Amino acid sequence: MKFGVIVFPGSNCDHDAFYAVTANLGQTAELIWHDSTSLGDVDAVILPGGFAYGDYLRCGAIAKFSPVMSAVRKFAGDGGLVLGICNGFQILVEAGLLPGALIRTRGLKFICRELRLRAATTDSPFTNAADPERVLRIPIAHGEGCYFADERTLDELEAEDRVAFRYIDNANGSLRDIAGVLNRERNVMGMMPHPERASDPLMGSADGLVVFQSMLQAGVRA
């Protein structure tokens, strides 16, 4: 399986994601610059964490206009797997590919720590290898990662089983403990925790590898 990792000016987790899917997952990957108009022959796309365009105006608000995002939208529309991690999640929300918003954390502080969470569904290409009973230890690192949506949207996410991950330790104040969500077609997911930073035992946890393993399983079945 070939992963495309999008690189925006200000991305700082692109090489982490690249390493996770190559060294830890054993797959191939390509770094794709923000001004590219094509994704090439990739099977899945990752929008990594960081501070795209300095997070000016609002996190992801400028990145959504990058030339590569037209290709990402088409890729997603054609059913391709798209994963947004942290800043990547914020970009997907700004681009209208995922519902809701990511706002300032509870306490208005940047939070960098390992949290406990669980997969809230296994019915997705990003969580099919997960055990919903297993507690995952995956770090967060954000100042604007509190998931917010109106009650109607939250109820829709619940009813349609589109909450991908929930915090056990809800440090940022996300509504209904939401750590990750899916689009209606279930081929796009955004999550604020960093699975690429928990994909190697040397990092203290390999729990995040389940996200990439799930994508691989979904790709093999497809």
Where are the predicted features?
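N-terminal beta1-alpha1 cap of cysteine-dependent amidohydrolase-like domains
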Residues: 1-85, 93-111, 118, 175, ...
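Active-site metal-binding loops of divalent metal-dependent hydrolases
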Residues: 50-51, 88, 143, 195
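Amide-donor transfer/coupling interface in amidating biosynthetic enzymes
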Residues: 73-77, 105-222
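Short, flexible active-site-adjacent loop segments at beta-strand->alpha-helix junctions, enriched
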Residues: 88-89, 123
